[in-house]
Amino acid sequence: MNIKTGGCSEDCSYCAQSSRYNTGLKASKMVNVESVLEAARIAKENGSSRFCMGAAWRDMRGRKTNLKNIKAMVTGVRALGMEACVTLGMIDAEQAKELKDAGLTAYNHNVDTSREHYPSVITTRTYDERLATIKNVSEAGIHVCTGGILGLGEKPEDHVGLIHTVATLPTHPESFPVNALVPIKGTPLGDSQVIKFDAILRTIATARLVLPSTIIRLAAGRNTMREEKQIMCFMAGANAVFTGEKMLTTACNGWEEDKEMFEKWGLRPMAVEETIQGQQEAAEKVKVDLSKVQASEFSTKAEASL
């Protein structure tokens, strides 16, 4: 869900939300907490296990009120029994800690492409600044969600470079989103050719080999693929999708459409208790229950000795 639309100061060549381009998108203030939680409830009712929230701005500097509201959104989403993910641009170590304390499951901050091709796409934020945010997120104990966009005018070796960057992080990310550029009129990449499907498939398959435990998420551009192509992506190694009304500002496959596809091809959506967050919480519960048993045994022994 886009919790704050447009008006971003960055110059990402692919993005409709940049204030530098005339895309017809109207900027808006951040939505209220309750509207986010209502959207999360609907997502859960339709089978989603994770709710993702994105805000269009460069970073979180000077946004204390926004951060307070976002933490309330995160806590509220978690109270619904869902995982919570946000993408808020660059954040520092203290902001990452605050989000972790609020219950944040994952933080999305894509590296977008290879280090070599990156300057051709964005000039207002460096590659190393992106990696610094990923480091802050990881060190705060939040799961990292980082991937890229295919179709930015890159070469095949840039797909290798993208995967190499992610695979050589100190710890492999929990999630690797694979986006296919949706050209938006008014942006510098608005007239770009659509990326060939075999490039998407090769990227997914390669990522699966070098990131064996990472969730590979089909993200933007999936709605442009025919059903059989989406299934080929799953066969190549993808094992999650973004679904719902919109993928930030671009169209997204709907819940009913995805449910029909999953049922047709024998794909079972992951239950909340099967997610990484769910498994961790189950493990913590076991620890708590075990400590109670041990405390009870100690108390019984103490009484017997008396």
Where are these regions (language model features)?
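Hydrophobic faces of well-ordered beta-strands that scaffold small-molecule active sites
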Residues: M1, F51-M53, A84-V86, Y107-H109, ...
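Glycine- and other small-residue-rich loops at beta-strand/loop junctions that grip anionic moieties
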Residues: M1, L88, T126, G148-G151, ...
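Glycine/charge-rich, flexible interdomain linkers and switch-proximal surface loops
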Residues: M1-K4, E94, M225
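Local cysteine-cluster metal-coordination motifs and their immediate loop/turn environment
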Residues: I3-S19
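Functionally engaged cysteine thiol sites
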Residues: C8, C52, C85, C145, ...
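Short coil/turn connectors at secondary-structure junctions
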Residues: S9, N46-S49, L80-M82, P212-S213, ...
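Conserved Radical SAM active-site core
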Residues: R20-G147, G151-T168
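Auxiliary Fe-S-binding modules of radical SAM enzymes
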Residues: A167-L306
